Amino acid sequence: MVKVGIVGGTGYTGVELLRLLAQHPQAEVVVITSRSEAGMPVAEMYPNLRGHYDGLAFSVPDVKTLGACDVVFFATPHGVAHALAGELLAAGTKVIDLSADFRLQDPVEWAKWYGQPHGAPQLLQDAVYGLPEVNREQIKNARLIAVPGCYPTATQLGFLPLLEAGIADNTRLIADCKSGVSGAGRGLSIGSLYSEANESFKAYAVKGHRHLPEITQGLRRAAGGDIGLTFVPHLVPMIRGIHSTLYATVADRSVDLQALFEKRYADEPFVDVMPAGSHPETRSVRGANVCRIAVHRPQGGDLVVVLSVIDNLVKGASGQAVQNMNILFGLDERAGLSHAGMMP
């Protein structure tokens, strides 16, 4: 049984980790921390978890207690894992970080986008980017895993087959992405209030979003060189979900795009390439650790459209984190993640 600790258990990704791990056959949450809620039983804050964590309460983060775990998940704002990850790694504990702290390999670039110096640049050489569909072998031997963001997960999985095959014009990629309001986190903000977000639909961060350098970093690796990406995120009035509509120019019209995508993801348990002509819906992946993809070539032209949907809290965060844990500890990759999407 893998002994699990969670730092930051009161946000959406924290409670989603608890929900998924409650049904995991080979993992047990033994520590969960929150400075603001220390002493409160988990089941009191989250009644949906009654009967699963009745003996577990939030505690103040303590390196000694966390260091006794096999793995510690950080479901925290950026900067927190910088301060604690090194001590946990020194104690022999594996670290899986859901924040952005170790996603970017360039600490200067990280500081530019997050507005503060990188707090642990010496650990970047140990950090493995936790996109299993790309880095599965590296994940198996990792000490520190950086779980990809939600937009980067949906966008990279949609573009990868085209870039790896070398058939797209890498200089003019477009990612037109929509997210539900849970992507903004559980903290109070005016933009995510019901009266502000409901019955409205808006773009934001067009000048530059923090996920842009992460997406670009991954796509460069796939393409084997520089890429040009325009990334425009939008907020839509739903709770969960990412819908990425991706555009790339593929001049060679003889390429069987459906076959290309099906072959690339044939052995991936959590990527579903839909039949030709399909339009995946976010509700089909709600609560599931699945990226559902469809590829189109409208009017037979040279512009290819890829539709990619995920649940931002599952495959875009906590589910992918558990998937990484399963790989890291040699477990069945599907363990605890077999939930079908919730419909309606």
From Swiss-Prot:
Catalytic activity: N-acetyl-L-glutamate 5-semialdehyde + phosphate + NADP(+) = N-acetyl-L-glutamyl 5-phosphate + NADPH + H(+)
Gene: argC
Compartments where found: Cytoplasm
GO molecular function: N-acetyl-gamma-glutamyl-phosphate reductase activity; NAD binding; NADP+ binding
Keyword Cytoplasm assigned: yes
Positions of the catalytic residues: 150
NCBIfam families in alphabetical order: argC
Superkingdom as given in the UniProt entry: Bacteria
PROSITE patterns noted in UniProt: ARGC
Species classification: Bacteria, Pseudomonadati, Pseudomonadota, Gammaproteobacteria, Pseudomonadales
Organism: Pseudomonas savastanoi pv. phaseolicola (strain 1448A / Race 6)
Protein name: N-acetyl-gamma-glutamyl-phosphate reductase
